[in-house]
A protein has these predicted regions:
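Hydrophobic alpha-helical transmembrane segments of membrane proteins
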Residues: 1-67, 83-209
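Short helix-to-coil transition segments within interhelical loops
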Residues: 73-78
Length: 209
């Protein structure tokens, strides 16, 4: 499975580099308003979305071709491992992007936001659950449309939250909300993985979907 992840990184190293750059540089854009804690929250939300919106997506794009599918089918790995590798790649990307954003914020003196990091983590669990679920159940084209819709929904949500003044960062830090949100997102992510494995197990190489 690690070899599959290594393959994705090597074949898509430009997008992996973009993920790193966005995660590191996003706090710089908000450095001018370092006293406003709400902006620190948006650093995590917008930064994590932008950082994670292309790397795994381009990896799925490569795997959606008939030639790549034949190659993957010839590997001595189970199809469940092929699916799990994509979900693990997504998980590693979200951890890396949030970690790099936190480090960059700390260096700039913005002080990493626990609330922002947690909200970004919960969002990305849902993001990959939906995107990868659509990819393995359908195809890359539909998954990419879903990716665009999720991006637009996120931007609209940030705008609405900012306009209404709803302190999502204060709500999510409450133990009840935090545990409920974390548990729900993990279950959705796990369910997406489970059903994607079942769907891909019945997929025949060469199918056009």
């Amino acid at each position: 499975m690690l070899q599959l992840i290594k393959k994705d990184i090597l074949f898509n190293w430009k997008w992996a580099l973009l993920l790193v750059l966005v995660a590191v540089l996003m706090p710089v854009l908000f450095f001018i308003d370092r006293e406003e804690t709400r902006f620190i929250l948006w650093v995590y939300i917008i930064g994590s979305v932008l950082a994670n919106s292309h790397f795994v997506s381009k990896s799925c794009y490569m795997d959606d071709s008939a030639q790549t599918r034949r190659f993957l089918a010839s590997l001595p790995v189970r199809r469940a491992q092929l699916v799990a590798a994509k979900y693990l790649l997504g998980f590693l990307c979200m951890v890396a992007s949030i970690g790099l954003t936190s480090l960059s914020s700390f260096v700039l003196g913005l002080y990493p936001s626990v609330q922002g990091a947690l909200i970004a983590f919960l969002y990305l669990l849902l993001y990959y659950a939906v995107f990868l679920g659509v990819f393995f159940h359908s195809n890359y084209s539909n998954a990419e449309k879903t990716n665009t819709a999720l991006m637009m929904l996120t931007i609209m949500s940030v705008f609405v939250l900012d306009r209404t003044g709803l302190r999502l960062d204060e709500m999510i830090i409450e133990p009840t909300y935090m545990l409920a949100g974390l548990g729900t997102c993990i279950m959705i992510f796990a369910a997406s993985l489970f059903f994607s494995v079942r769907s891909f197990d019945h997929f025949q190489v060469g199918d056009s979907r």
